Each structure stands twice: as C-alpha cells, then as structure tokens.
C-alpha cells in the first residue's frame, strides 16, 4: 500500500479538530491483532480496542473469512417483510448470552441507533398497554447514549447538547455518581454513593411516577471517564423502577461482550434491565451493527392486531445486514472458542495493579478501573479544558501506543487478546507520557 497521503480536504471528520488534524495527520493503513500500522510504517499498539469495540483484536482471520464468504453469497437483503438465516441465528445467539429475561433482539447499525430504538420501544410499549401518559424519560448527568436526538436528550454530555439547541421535551437527569472527595482512587466499585439513587424517587415525586416511561443509564459511564457505579447503586435504581412500573434501559454499548469480564455489565453488577442496548463488541468493530434486547412482556405487548400487520413502525435499511450478521456470529464464536472473556477476567487484576501505581504521577487526581476498563483523570490546565489529556494522547501515540481521551481523562481498554505484558506496556506508556508533559 502506498505511503502517500490522500487529499485530506474534503472529509469532515467526526469528533475531531479537523484543522489541527489536517496539519498533523495520524493515518493508519493496516491493522493486525494488537497493532495498527501507520501510513509511514510505524507500529502503534491499540490500547483502546479501536473505539471500545475491537475486543477480538484487529483483522481476526476467522471473522475476516466469515465476512468475505458472506459477501460472496448474499451481499444484502432487506429485513422488511423478508429475512435470511444468519440474522435469525445471530438473534438466537445473543439471547442465549444475555440475562435470562431478555428474549428478543431488534437490530440496528450502531449504538446511537440502538438507543433511539430503545426509547421508541419504551414509549410505544406503554401506549400499547393503555398508558400513553407515560412520556417522560430520565437519563443521567455525564451519561453518553450516542448522538441521535433521543440519545443526546437523555445523555448528559454538555458539549454534545449545547451546539444543537432544543432537545426532546420531558427529559430529566439524575446526578452522576463521580465524587472526588469521597471516591478518588477507588479500586473497583466505590463504597460511597449508593444513596444517590434516591434522587430518582425525588424526580418521580416531582413529576408523578405515572408519567415516566423509562430510566436509561450505562452500567459504567465510559465516555464520561469510566465512572464505576457505587456498590448497590444500580440495584436501588432497579428497585425504584420496579416500584413505579418504569422501564429500566441499560446502555451496554461499551460494557457488553466481555469488557467487565462477564457477558454484560448487567451480569457483573447483578441487575437485569427491561431493555438493553448493544453494539461495538458484537462484531469486534468489523462491520457496523447495534441491537436492542427486550424482555418477553415488552415484545408481547406489540404482538396484537391482525397477524400480518406491522407491529412496530420502525427499522433501518441496513437492519440485520447479512455482512454484519456474519461478522457478529463469527465474533461471538471467536469469543467463545478462544476464551477471550476469560482472558479479560485474567487481565483485569493486571490492569488494576498497574493503573493504581500511576497514583502520585504528574497531574493525576483520580484513577478508576473495573474489568478490562481503566481511566486516569488529570487536573485540567486552567482555561484550557481537555488540553492536558490531549497532550498525553499525542505523547502516547508518538511512543507507539493508542489511548483514548474524554475531557481530561485518559481511558484504556485493551483488546481481550492482549497479554499481561501488553497491558503493562499500555499503562507504563501513559505513566511515561505523564512525566514528559507539562
């Protein structure tokens, strides 16, 4: 492949400082296993699984083979009134993996679409049961639920909201659980903070619980900075939702598919949602795919009227795409056959031990970890939020390791094919980079 750069002018890049990038481009041309190859033939270790998604590493031969074979056999088939065997097999496999009460899968093309689909399912479910007055939605401060209008409305990332003006009406937000005074440098789940779930009751009493359709949150708030839920917090949220007939949606786009060491974050924290959103790791990042898993009673509420009538007026041109389904099935088989979730569990203590040693390094004010997820929060430069973390990102890249920044937090989530030495290299590169910057 040529080392010459393409014309960079016309591509409007997402979540990127386009002007800076085009003056200082970082371009990948190949990937394999734990590593990218840059356009100028440098090797970069992937310490963030692409974008929280390449759990089986890059270009896994069995996943590549499945995609190639599917492209040669059936390249596309609409899911509207038609089907193909691979997507039904994918749905069955997902239900087998999910908590027992989640029995049906609806397919999308991304986590953002999965969230907007989940919100529509929640609203339509209540209408189908004669409770159309349940229209309010409750998210969380610093929650990230993709970039659709539904997702940014229930989400709590202010930069993702303020550019666009009006959001969906009737949305409230719980406070987030991140508290440096009480939880700085917590190892695993913080002990302080389960009482913050009681704010949900306060919001419900303000509006009348019978007007609320759903509560949505991430088991671990990944994009906010890897905020781990306090012990008992999610259980309390579940109990309050049950008490008032409110659906609980858990956004498992990041935490799903082994990232916590369990199949899903729901399993790790012992809380089963009514609706679960998934994406990213379900195809190990190879082909865009997302999905929504729901309980039996939610699916059944739609199965009324004439048998040949459309039950849910929603879907996408590429819902259940054959290539995505083939990639997904192959990915789930790789996870199982190669014991990758078990490897993630084995690597979690290594990540924990290494990342906690960063305490005391330049500018560090907090460290968090759970499963194969870790984050280091930095004291921001006054008047220049995000600048310090971006400096670490660039320094790590120059040293041959890719990490992720969100605000002034550095996130690490290596692929499950990593070795203990790989994990140590990622964390040590972050530590060395912190020592190298101002």
Language-model features: where?
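Conserved N-terminal phosphate-binding loop of PLP-dependent enzymes in the Aspartate aminotransferase
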Residues: 1-438
């Amino acid at each position: 492949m040529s080392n010459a750069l393409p014309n960079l002018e016309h591509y409007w890049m997402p979540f990127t400082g386009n002007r800076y990038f085009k003056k200082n481009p970082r371009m990948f041309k190949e990937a394999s296993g734990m590593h990218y190859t840059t356009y100028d033939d440098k090797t970069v270790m992937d310490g963030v699984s692409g974008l929280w998604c390449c759990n089986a590493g890059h270009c896994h031969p069995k996943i590549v083979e499945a995609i190639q074979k599917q492209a040669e056999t059936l390249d596309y088939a609409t899911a509207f009134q038609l089907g193909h065997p691979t997507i039904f097999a994918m749905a069955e496999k997902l239900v087998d993996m999910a908590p027992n009460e989640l029995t049906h899968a609806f397919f999308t093309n991304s986590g953002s679409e999965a969230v907007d689909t989940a919100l529509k399912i929640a609203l339509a479910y209540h209408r189908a049961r004669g409770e159309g007055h349940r229209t309010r939605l409750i998210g969380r401060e610093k929650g990230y639920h993709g970039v659709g209008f539904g997702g940014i409305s229930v989400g709590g990332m202010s930069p993702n909201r303020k550019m666009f003006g009006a959001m969906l009406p009737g949305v409230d937000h719980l406070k987030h659980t991140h508290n440096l005074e009480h939880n700085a440098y917590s190892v695993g789940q913080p002990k302080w903070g389960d009482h913050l779930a009681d704010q949900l009751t306060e919001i419900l009493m303000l509006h009348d619980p019978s007007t609320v359709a759903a509560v949505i949150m991430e088991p671990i708030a990944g994009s906010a900075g890897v905020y781990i839920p306090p012990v008992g917090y999610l259980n309390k949220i579940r109990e309050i939702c049950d008490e008032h007939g409110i659906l609980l949606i858990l956004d498992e786009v990041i935490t799903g598919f082994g990232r916590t060491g369990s199949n899903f974050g729901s399993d790790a924290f012992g809380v089963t949602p009514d609706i679960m959103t998934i994406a990213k790791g379900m195809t190990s990042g190879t082909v865009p795919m997302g999905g929504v898993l729901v309980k039996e009673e939610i699916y059944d509420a739609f199965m009324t009227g004439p048998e040949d009538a459309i039950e849910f007026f929603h879907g996408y041109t590429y819902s259940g795409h054959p290539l995505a389904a083939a990639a997904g099935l192959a990915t789930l088989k790789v996870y199982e056959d190669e014991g990758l979730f078990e490897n993630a569990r084995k690597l979690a203590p290594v990540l924990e031990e290494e990342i906690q040693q960063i305490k005391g390094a330049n500018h560090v004010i907090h460290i968090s970890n759970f499963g194969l997820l870790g984050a280091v929060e930095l004291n921001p430069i006054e008047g220049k939020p995000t600048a310090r973390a971006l400096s670490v990102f660039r320094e790590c890249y120059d040293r041959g390791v890719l990490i992720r920044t969100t605000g002034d937090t550095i996130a690490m989530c290596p692929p499950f094919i990593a070795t203990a030495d790989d994990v140590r290299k990622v964390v040590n590169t972050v530590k060395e980079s912190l020592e190298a910057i101002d």
